[in-house]
């Protein structure tokens, strides 16, 4: 049985960030990725937004990691030359009954330490975004966009320069706690059984499945809930210069406008609860999406939109259930030395990745190395 020092399961942005943090701390790190390349799931199927920290309950892990991670991510991108823009975002109340919700998010943001939001007068937001129809709006100057692929490439480069290794096409099939860490059974073309003092489960959509396979007590394995979202791209030139977000809906942040680094506008994501990982783009999504967009952008009626992408959010609560916080469960929770499980890392996971990596790896920083 091959013996390793530290194993990270999952090479999405959070897994790569965690592996990088461990490697920079002097650990010998191996990343196991089930897919042929890094970031094939949520890390590359999202809006690529750097969130300010507006929506999340004060004191929650989402709030703390988002605000800290935002600043860390902006610094990291600037230092590494990763394409990003602090483009800003308008939060809009399309109707009068949404104004209290908008003001609630203003209060929430301030409680989270986001102190740069500004309530706009009508003439101000009309000057910023003439196509937007609303009754109230708030500007978030610290919201931005980032090239998530370039970010993952940079994190992987840091990991490899620090001596870490990425092994793709290597799904985790099973395992168990041992006296000095964990056994991990790895599939693929050349199945192998390994022993590692430290295992960090960043498997994203499959994190509950992997946790159970490694022997995590069932009481500490949340259910896997999948919320698929669909994005449509706006054909032709974008009328927007920044992101535009309506008031959130159940399961997501509403059908919002995002811009990529080339300036193309996309609308989405919507929410469709599914029971398995499936990236099919079903027909019939456009009409409902157009209705949602028209509430704050009436000009959508005269514009063509085309299917762009779909992604799946990893959730631990299903439809009709209260939204859940990020979960980072270490030995103090589940009782298995050397194991850290990350669950429900949906939005703002991209923004929070560097902060989550520090929090997760701190739980096993003192784990002994393999002799």
Identify the function of each model-found stretch.
Residues 21, 50, 82-85, 180, ...:
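Active-site substrate-recognition segment that forms the wall
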Residues 48-124, 134, 254:
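Dinucleotide-binding Rossmann-like beta1-alpha1 core, especially the glycine-rich loop
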Residues 57-68, 92-101, 138-157, 167, ...:
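Short beta-strand to alpha-helix junction loop
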């Amino acid at each position: 049985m091959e013996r390793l020092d530290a194993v990270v399961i999952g090479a999405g942005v959070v897994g790569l960030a965690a592996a990088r943090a461990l490697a920079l701390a002097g650990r010998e790190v191996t990343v196991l990725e089930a897919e042929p390349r890094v970031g094939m799931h949520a890390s590359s199927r999202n809006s690529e937004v750097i969130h300010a920290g507006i929506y999340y309950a004060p004191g929650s892990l989402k709030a703390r990691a988002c605000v800290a991670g935002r600043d860390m991510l902006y610094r990291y991108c600037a230092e590494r030359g990763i394409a990003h823009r602090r483009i800003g975002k308008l939060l809009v109340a399309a109707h009068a009954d949404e104004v209290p919700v908008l003001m609630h998010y203003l209060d929430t943001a301030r409680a989270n330490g986001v102190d740069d939001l500004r309530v706009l007068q009508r003439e101000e937001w009309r000057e910023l975004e003439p196509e937007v129809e609303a009754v109230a709006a708030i500007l978030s100057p610290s919201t931005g966009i980032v090239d998530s692929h370039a970010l993952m490439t940079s994190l992987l480069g840091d990991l490899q320069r620090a001596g870490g290794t990425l092994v793709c096409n290597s799904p985790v099939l099973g395992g168990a706690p041992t006296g000095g860490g964990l056994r991990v059974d790895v599939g693929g073309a050349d199945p192998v059984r390994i022993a590692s003092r430290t295992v960090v489960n960043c498997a994203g959509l499959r994190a509950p499945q992997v946790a159970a396979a490694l022997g995590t007590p069932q009481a500490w394995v949340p259910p896997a809930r999948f919320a698929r979202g669909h994005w449509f791209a706006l054909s032709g030139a974008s009328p927007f210069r920044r992101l535009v977000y309506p008031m959130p809906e159940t399961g997501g942040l509403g059908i919002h406008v995002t811009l990529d680094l080339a300036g193309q506008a996309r609308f989405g994501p919507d929410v469709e609860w599914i029971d398995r990982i499936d990236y099919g783009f079903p027909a019939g999504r456009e009409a409902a999406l157009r209705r949602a967009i028209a509430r704050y952008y009436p000009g959508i009626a005269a514009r063509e939109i085309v299917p762009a992408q779909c992604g799946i959010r990893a959730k631990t609560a299903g439809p009709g259930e209260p939204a859940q916080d990020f979960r980072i469960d270490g030995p103090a929770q589940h009782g298995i030395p050397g194991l850290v499980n990350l669950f429900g890392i949906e939005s703002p996971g991209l923004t929070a990745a560097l902060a989550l990596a520090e929090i997760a790896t701190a739980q096993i920083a003192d784990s002994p190395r393999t002799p």
